[in-house]
Amino acid sequence: MSSGIVLLIVAIVLVVIIAYLIAIIIRKRNDSLITKLEERKQNLFDLPVNDEIEEVKKLHLIGQSQTTFREWNQKWVDLSLNSFSDIENHIFEAENLNDTFNFIRAHSQINNIESQLNLAEEDIKAIREALAVLKEQEEKNSARVLHALEMYESLQASIEEGDSNFGITMPEIEKQLKNIEAEFSQFVTLNSSGDPVEASEILDRAEEHTIALGQMTEKIPAIVAKLEDDFPDQLDDLESGYRRLLEENYHFPEKNIEERFQEVREAIGNNSNELVSLDLDKAESENEAIQEKIDSLYDIFEREIRAHKNIVKSKKIIPAYLEHAKKNNEQLEAEIERLNHRYILNEKEELNVRDFNEEIASVEKDVLPIIENFDTQEKPFSVLEDKFDRAIKKLDLVEEGQLDVFNSLKNIENVEKTARQKLDSYINRLHAIKRFMEKRNLPGIPQDFLSVFFTTSAQLEALMDELNRARIHIETVNRMTEAATAAVENLEETAYRVVQNATLTEQLLQYSNRYRSFEPSVQESFDIALKLFETDYDYQGSFDEISYSLETVEPGVTDRFVSSYEKTRETIRF
């Protein structure tokens, strides 16, 4: 056998071996793919879709929800019965093709199975999502329906439990309860017949009506309590109180109280009748108006009761206050009469006392008859309270005026005593000032000082004459004492000023000697100042002349002399 043939045989054997190995590899790879597809199919088949379907079935779906559920359930049935069987057959066929090394058809079958599984996965995902949505929606709807029913049943129970609190509104409340119940029945009918949209609208209305009625039933008891209990009780209290006050001799400025009672009673009845319609805003507004009418009646009675208490106190105070005022006036009249012997008084005091008598008489005339006949009088106590208050205020003013007059009279004798003491003091001061001036040994007394001195002396003599009269005019004494005080103080200041100017002028004239020989202006001023000092007795002018001249040659010299003088100035001894 030639080597060529051998090589050909070897090559053929190698090709066969390689082909076989490749076939084995492809087969194993396909086996692996088929196994994975089998696992995917089994995983899909093992999903709890049946359990989820059973859970949704237990919800007892109705209407459109039930139709939708049936569609998705049928889709699952088709998928589980047909699609999975078809996939199983294709897998079996792919295994046979692979085992018989029909790799091309096996590969095609594997691709086909994978596509079927992808579609099955998508369908199962859609089915499960749809079931979840149906379950969630149904649970929400069930919870909503359950909540609405529970709310209605709770409202119904609370109304039945407190039916006595709703009074005349009970028939209308029961009517609205029946209407709500009818709406729930209509909801069930529509929902069962497959009309979920309209059923939902009916449920919305039933919920709204339940909530609205619940809110009403929360307000109604308070409104009914006022109309059936509070207002009638208050009105009975007012009417019985009114009768009792009339028996106790109370009178009222308001003449329509009985009519106002009737108005309140009618308003209560009208609001009770209108409450049947359950217009609670209007009922509450009417209740507020009724309460205001009742409160206004209470205010009237309380005003008169309060006035009566005040009057009882005032009718005890006023007679004693009148006696006190009259006694004060008598004392004032006696004091004025006593003082008139010695003093000429201001007519104002006597006029005031006469005015006091008139005010007292006016109060006696206006108030005492009422107090004396208090148990039979026919005026409202509030009117009498105002009259009594005015009387007490009038007596308060009288007493204040009496105190003013009393203090004024009490001060009259002190005024005279003080005036005499001041007069004696001023006369002594006048003599002391005169001695003070004489001791200065001045060339002469300035005319302005003499004018002030004689004016002061004349004022003191006039005050003395007034005090020596048989009847002293006390106001004149007051004015003259004030004038004398000012005159003496002015005289004292004038004396100090004259002596200071004279003393300082003498000192400056002596001091100017050091400048006269070489300062012509100082010599000239010296001559003028000396003439003013010794001849004219114009000490102020002389001081001004010499001080001005010295300041031109020695600034500050005048202040130095003035400061030294003020430290050693002699005072007038009184």
Swiss-Prot record:
GO terms for biological process: division septum assembly; septin ring assembly. Residues 1-7 are extracellular. Residues 102-141, 255-368, 409-495 form a coiled coil. The chain crosses the membrane at residues 8-26. Pfam families: EzrA. Residues 27-574 are cytoplasmic. Signal peptide: none annotated. It is a single-pass membrane protein. It is found in: Cell membrane. One of its GO terms (cellular component) is septin ring. The keyword NAD does not apply. Belongs to the EzrA family. Negative regulator of FtsZ ring formation; modulates the frequency and position of FtsZ ring formation. Inhibits FtsZ ring formation at polar sites. Interacts either with FtsZ or with one of its binding partners to promote depolymerization. This is Septation ring formation regulator EzrA. It comes from Streptococcus mutans serotype c (strain ATCC 700610 / UA159). The gene is ezrA.
